[in-house]
A protein has these predicted regions:
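Acidic, surface-exposed loops and disordered segments
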Residues: 1-217
Length: 217
């Protein structure tokens, strides 16, 4: 893929609001997108996420009153994803220890040099000293995951749209009631739908480069 094709792909990627309900993403293509999400980068490589693929039609109907910004995705898109974010991802948490031992295959305890680097990064550099700040920082990682999946989808000719229009507390309570979320461990970060648009692509409206880009010599 050359530079011109890369830019053309950005223009082709479109936050579609209308989807063809009769067109479905193939199993192989969807497996590829999930793999892209799995391989996405995250701060310190902690992967503080989980994806829920919502296929249950009854649950889609139930979510509509509490997810106004997701109606088009719940009604017509081929695949609808709820991105969960892990809570309490501190340097000394059981989860971080588990990641280091089982995924990174490295020795790790809260007194090790690497643990202290993470501690300093979280507490002093990023000021992650509250439950909310930790949640927001971890949520940023899920947006990277979602963005990577959306761009990979565009490469496969699949449309997508990120979704933030929902009542977080109500959605979390509903998912917990259904047994798909433990709010002591996870929260809802963002949603996205994937499928094939049933509308024309409108030209992108963006600031000119000189407004949003500056070089420091």
């Amino acid at each position: 893929m050359d530079r011109e094709q890369v830019i053309a792909l950005q223009h082709q990627r479109f936050a579609a609001k209308k989807y063809d309900p009769n067109r479905r993403i193939s199993e192989k293509d969807w497996e590829a997108l999930v793999e892209v999400g799995r391989l996405a980068p995250s701060s310190i490589g902690l992967e503080p996420w989980k994806m829920l693929l919502l296929k249950n039609e009854r649950m889609k109907e139930d979510l509509k009153p509490m997810a106004w910004g997701a109606l088009f995705g719940l009604e017509g898109a081929s695949h609808f994803v709820i991105y969960l974010v892990r809570k309490g991802v501190t340097y000394d948490s059981d989860y971080v220890k588990k990641v280091m031992h089982e995924v990174k295959k490295r020795d790790y305890d809260t007194h090790s040099r690497f643990a202290q680097i993470i501690k300093n990064f979280q507490e002093n550099d990023m000021k992650l000293n509250s439950e909310r700040s930790l949640f927001d920082w971890a949520s940023k990682q899920t947006y990277i995951q979602m963005a990577n999946m959306m761009m990979a989808a565009a490469m496969l000719g699949i449309d997508s749209c990120p979704i933030e229009g929902y009542d977080q507390e109500k959605v979390e309570a509903y998912l917990e009631e259904k047994g798909y979320l433990n709010t002591a461990e996870f929260g809802v970060s963002v949603m996205a739908c994937f499928g094939y648009r049933n509308q024309e692509i409108t030209p992108k409206t963006r600031w000119k480069t000189e407004v949003i880009y500056e070089v420091i010599e």
